[in-house]
Amino acid sequence: MRKEGILYSETNLFRKLRLIDLEMHGRKFLYNRDVWWETLLKQLGLSKLKGPWIHETTLRYWKTYAGASPLFYDTISTIQRLKKAGFRLGMVSDSDGTPGMKMKRIRRQPFLKSLEAIVVAGEDTQSVKPSRRPFTLIAERLGLRPKNCVYIGDNPNTDIEGAKGVGMMMILVKRRGPKGGHPDYLARSLGDATILLMRN
């Protein structure tokens, strides 16, 4: 935008992106980060600036900001505890809209070796969550029946319906973002979810 002589403060831009992000997380369709920038331009009355640079900006985003995003504080300890207790661990995550990008990011995570199976919904399956197929596929890859699986998620709009729809127990971790839904259990953190699992 600077090249076009248009200047906005980074604070205002990030505030708008945050609101767009929350809205997109509340929907039940493929989360394409390119839409971030297109929506932002539309809100700023700058739709005429759309072009190839939008996707280039998305790629830059993943290489910088998202690449440096920290895990939740209890992620590693939770995974280690569950692994030690004999749980078989897998992950279901929606595609970012850029083929291969989500898996590339997952491969960089320190917990990768603890996962026995990974499903990128929207790439390994035709539909993203809450479609049931990503959930049945992760169970298949783990060699388990869905009713013998527990799904821990933090987005009520995408995680509850799909997991419970195939017969999995569903634990929802309360985070910022969309509210609602009817999980089997509600947890304040991954650590709390672990305690629930140990009890059941």
Residue ranges, per PLM feature:
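Asp-based, Mg2+/Mn2+-dependent phosphohydrolase catalytic module
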Residues: 8, 49, 76, 80-83, ...
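N-terminal helical cap/lid subdomain that shapes the substrate entry/recognition surface
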Residues: 1-80, 84-85
